[in-house]
Amino acid sequence: MTTPQPSQVRVAVTQAEPVWLDLKATVDKTCSLIAEAASKGAQLVSFPECWIPGYPAWIWTRPVDQELHSRYIQNSLTVSSPEMTQICKSANENNVIVVLGFSENIHNSLYISQAIISNTGSILTTRKKIKATHMERTIFGDAFADCLDSVVETAVGRVGALSCWEHIQPLLKYHTCAQREAIHVAAWPPLFEWGGPEDESLFSMSRDGTIALARTYAIESSSFVLHTTAVISQEGVEKMRTATGAIMNMPGGGSSAIFGPDGRLLSKPLLPTEEGIIYADLEMHDIYKTKAFVDVLGHYSRPDLLWLGVGSCDRRHVKEDAEERREDRVEVL
């Protein structure tokens, strides 16, 4: 049953620094931010990519760091854990929907994951990034089929989430849009200004490049986009040992923002080095204004000519042959 869409939703987008490589302390900070957002009337609060226990910034400076990697595994979050229960309890106590980015530990293998937690403290979905980006593959594994479980029904309407460069995956974006989200959380690590034509890094990985992706997603999907980024301080740079690296080598990285379904900016920015929470009151009826012009899953589409096929089976390590044949099917949207 579809939840009636409220006419206005107050959202909170964090721009904060995790307690690097410290599971317990970052979970405590998460709950404090949830409570702070609730005290300002927020009905939904979003967190960055790998917020717990912080994005592994060192991977862009050196591919192997056994000490930090070991600590990272030990401080990554398990879904069935007292720490996740603590976060769910905070969501319930504060009556807030939480969209959480975290490094997920499954038997000491790690995945870039997101969870959407209801305002009653129930985990509505968990999903994994479909493919770790470039140097992230030195730390994280690929997704399971649950990477497609990206949109759920909530008390404020349909809420979805993707992580980082998933926002340049056309098929994944289309599949997410097809689930009819009204609010989309785009989770990112710290992001920095592009250095200009002499900068060897990619513009698409910069602050302005990723904001362009957020605005594009809002326009394509006719949804509100909560562009959620983290901050790294000088202390964080020292802990990650990234001062000589190409990115995340200086304090900053914050560029959190909120965009309307036509791509317009709805929030006021914080400074890149500033921790805080940005808020916006979303006028949900604005979605109808954009849908009247363009609906890429409706009147502005041609599924008779172009459509998306989705593999629906989950490849487990141990599976009976008959079960394999039964589940190996393709769903067409």
UniProtKB/Swiss-Prot annotation:
Q: Which PANTHER family match?
A: ARYLACETONITRILASE, NITRILASE
Q: Which GO terms describe its molecular function?
A: arylacetonitrilase activity; hydro-lyase activity
What are the protein's UniProt keywords?
A: Hydrolase
Protein family per UniProt = Belongs to the carbon-nitrogen hydrolase superfamily. Nitrilase family.
Reaction(s) this enzyme catalyzes, per UniProt? a nitrile + 2 H2O = a carboxylate + NH4(+); 4-chlorophenylacetonitrile + 2 H2O = 4-chlorophenylacetate + NH4(+)
Enzyme class, top EC level, equals hydrolase
- Name of the protein in its database record: Arylacetonitrilase
Instruction: Please explain the role this protein plays, according to its UniProt record.
Output: Nitrilase that hydrolyzes preferentially phenylacetonitrile, (R,S)-mandelonitrile, and 3-indolylacetonitrile.
- Looking at the record, the residues that make up the CN hydrolase domain are 9-284
What residues sit in the active site? E49, K129, C164
**Stored InterPro entries:** C-N_Hydrolase, C-N_Hydrolase_sf, Nitrilase/CN_hydratase_CS, Nitrilases_CHs
Q: What is its EC number?
A: 3.5.5.1, 3.5.5.5
Organism expressing this protein natively: Aspergillus oryzae (strain ATCC 42149 / RIB 40) (Yellow koji mold)
